[in-house]
Curated annotation (Swiss-Prot):
Organism of derivation: Histophilus somni (strain 2336) (Haemophilus somnus)
HAMAP family: Ribosomal_bL12
Pfam families for this protein: Ribosomal_L12 (PF00542), Ribosomal_L12_N (PF16320)
Taxon lineage: Bacteria, Pseudomonadati, Pseudomonadota, Gammaproteobacteria, Pasteurellales
UniProt xrefs under InterPro entries: Ribosomal_bL12 (IPR000206), Ribosomal_bL12_C (IPR013823), Ribosomal_bL12_C/ClpS-like (IPR014719), Ribosomal_bL12_oligo (IPR008932), Ribosomal_bL12_oligo_N_sf (IPR036235)
Keyword Ribonucleoprotein tagged: yes
CDD domains: Ribosomal_L7_L12 (cd00387)
Entry keyword set: Ribonucleoprotein, Ribosomal protein
Summary of the function given for this chain in its UniProt record: Forms part of the ribosomal stalk which helps the ribosome interact with GTP-bound translation factors. Is thus essential for accurate translation.
Protein name as catalogued: Large ribosomal subunit protein bL12
GO BP annotation list: translation
Keyword Ribosomal protein: yes
Length: 122
């Protein structure tokens, strides 16, 4: 049975942010591509090409008012236990994940901000 584009979009829309990030990673591995948009920089003077950053760090800047929701989001994103996630959230600013793709970093930032945290991508 062949799925239509509409069915695929509906299936993706029903997934959580974490599941979508995992799907993107699996697709990148399967097809040997990157979801990050390729940027071409043309220099006016000498032939110098600016390198686009491909690895990003997600930093929890502040837990916000709803620490419980942030701890749950951190646990889901990192796989840490309850105590480790709580300690990480309370020690903000703290690195949550390092060396991840831009798409994964953006998805994680969105998920944590929805829980009430202040997040930075570096």
């Amino acid at each position: 049975m062949s799925l239509t584009n509409e069915q695929i979009i509906e299936a993706i829309a029903s997934k959580t942010v974490t599941e979508i990030v995992e799907l993107i990673s699996a697709m990148e591995e399967k097809f040997g591509v990157s979801a990050a948009a390729a940027a071409v920089a043309v220099a006016a003077g000498p032939a110098e090409v600016a390198e686009e950053k491909t690895e990003f760090d997600v930093v929890l800047a502040e837990a916000g008012a709803n620490k419980v929701a942030v701890i749950k989001a951190v646990r889901g994103a990192t796989g840490l236990g309850l105590k480790e996630a709580k300690d990480l959230v309370e020690s903000a600013p703290a690195n949550l994940k390092e060396g991840i793709s831009k798409a994964e970093a953006e998805a994680l930032k969105k998920e944590l901000e929805e829980a009430g945290a202040k997040v930075e991508i570096k």
